[in-house]
Structure formats: C-alpha cells, structure tokens
C-alpha cells in the first residue's frame, strides 16, 4: 500500500499526463464529409507543432475523399524546404466510425469530433506513443470565410484538451494559405 501511494505521489509530482480525446462524433457518415475544406483554425498541445510556417503539424487540409474500402484520403498542403508541397494521407477506418488510424506526420490517429457536413468539421490528430505524446486539432470550413459558429464549437471542444497554442485565420489568410 505504501508503494502504491508513493507511486501515485511521484506520478502526480512529475506531471505524468496522458492526452486522451474522449469526445468523438457518433454515427459519422464518411460519404458526407467528401469534398473541399479550408483550415479555419488550429490548436496543439505543444507550441512547436504549429509555431512556424514549416512546423510539423501546420498543415492545410484541402480535400477529404472517402475510399471504396471506407478509409479516408486526406489531401493537404504543407510548407517544406521553403515551398508549398501537396501531401496525401490515407486514414484507415477502425471499428469506431469517427476514428481513423494513420502513419503520417508522426501521428497515429485522426479523430472526428464534430461536423454538420455542410459548413464545418472539427478533428484532431493524436500521437499516443511515449514519450512524444501530442495532439493537434483543426476546425475546417467548406468556404474560405470566417464561421463564428464553427469557431465557437471548436473552442468548446478544446476546453477539455491540453492545448497550448491556437491559430485562427481571417478570410484573406484563408485564401493565401499554402497552395501548390
């Protein structure tokens, strides 16, 4: 018992913290998320994931394409070596409709938090591998315009998560995002 209390005390003192996203969308219809999207806002658990134009998870989602197998193809833009590069990521379906497995950008899961399919989609990319646990989330919109309702939902979803940096883009910045 003393060892258990000591271990618990050490864990609390050392700040051991797992990043866990508990809120995912129920009943996601992957076919309805297909199409063009724009990255309106981003947030991350670690400042270095988004702080610079070429930061590892500062990516701009361009399009989501469901595959016949039920996976999700994610087309995105990312700054690399001083220029904009297009990337394609395949997010593999899992038993949970709103959770996908990926092996890209040093992340291992994509979780859809919420969407109305027509205007906005909120998602997070999670790396649960020790010791580099990290979380980055985005608010996507269908048109390159600021959507205050979507931003409010994004901020509400982030409250339960350990975010340390948040970026939001105005319409001019949305139009000027990394494009190939």
Swiss-Prot record:
Source organism superkingdom: Eukaryota
Protein name: Beta-lactoglobulin-1/B
Keywords for this protein: Disulfide bond, Milk protein, Retinol-binding, Secreted, Signal, Transport
Alphabetized SUPFAM superfamilies for the sequence: Lipocalins
Transport as UniProt keyword: yes
UniProt PTM: Alternate disulfide bonds occur in equal amounts.
Signal peptide: 1-18
One cellular component (GO) term of this entry: extracellular region
GO MF annotation terms: retinol binding
Function (record text): Lactoglobulin is the primary component of whey, it binds retinol and is probably involved in the transport of that molecule.
Family: Belongs to the calycin superfamily. Lipocalin family.
UniProt xrefs under InterPro entries: Blactoglobulin, Calycin, Lipocalin, Lipocalin_CS, Lipocln_cytosolic_FA-bd_dom
Cysteine disulfide links: 84-178, 124-137, 124-139
KW Acyltransferase (keyword) present: no
Subunit structure: Under physiological conditions beta-lactoglobulin exists as an equilibrium mixture of monomeric and dimeric forms.
Compartment annotation: Secreted
Coiled-coil segments: none
Main location: secreted
Effect caused by changing residue 166 to Q: In lactoglobulin 3=C
